[in-house]
Each structure stands twice: as C-alpha cells, then as structure tokens.
C-alpha cells in the first residue's frame, strides 16, 4: 500500500549550470508507523524537471516516524540555468506501508 504527497518549492531559485543545490519545500511530511506495519518514504523528482537536466543527487529513503520538511538535493546537468518558481511542484514523496 502507498500514499503520495506532492511537494512544492518554497522559494524561487535559479540553479546555475553544474551546481549542486538544496531545495527547500513548503510541505511538512510525517511518515506514520503503525503497530505491525513497516513504513518508509521515497522522493521522486518530476519527470519534466529530469528531462530539463535536473538530477536528483540523494536517493536515501525517509525512515518510519520521520517528521519534517524534506530537503531535496539536485544538480543542474544542463547547458543553461534552470529556474524553479515558488509553489512549483518539484516531485512526490511516496510513502510505502508493508505488513510484517
């Protein structure tokens, strides 16, 4: 079973060519862990941003009972700067739940 949380960019930013940056998101996420269930979260960058040359640098899953605002680390691997406006959707956090 899974649940999808859409994440949006908090502040406008321009990512220069070759730069690695941390992008702050607006939403706070809580990955609940119920008794008898194992939960974790995984962030996926929007495909349209990946096609522009934005690469997701960190793929570590978010552990159970994690609460906070995710910090997304990306690299601009394109030949031109990439602009992200405030409230643009950056990607989705998928929260997976498995029974023991």
Each model region followed by its residue ranges:
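DUTPase catalytic domain/fold
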Residues: 1-100
């Amino acid at each position: 079973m899974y649940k999808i949380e859409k994440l949006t960019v908090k502040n406008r930013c321009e990512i220069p060519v070759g730069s690695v940056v941390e992008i702050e998101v607006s939403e706070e996420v809580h990955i609940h862990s119920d008794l008898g269930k194992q939960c974790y979260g995984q962030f996926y960058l929007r495909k349209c941003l990946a096609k522009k040359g934005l690469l997701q640098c960190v793929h570590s899953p978010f552990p159970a009972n994690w609460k906070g605002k995710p910090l997304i680390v990306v690299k601009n691997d394109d030949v031109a700067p990439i602009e992200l406006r405030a409230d643009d959707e950056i990607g989705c956090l998928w929260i997976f739940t498995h029974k023991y």
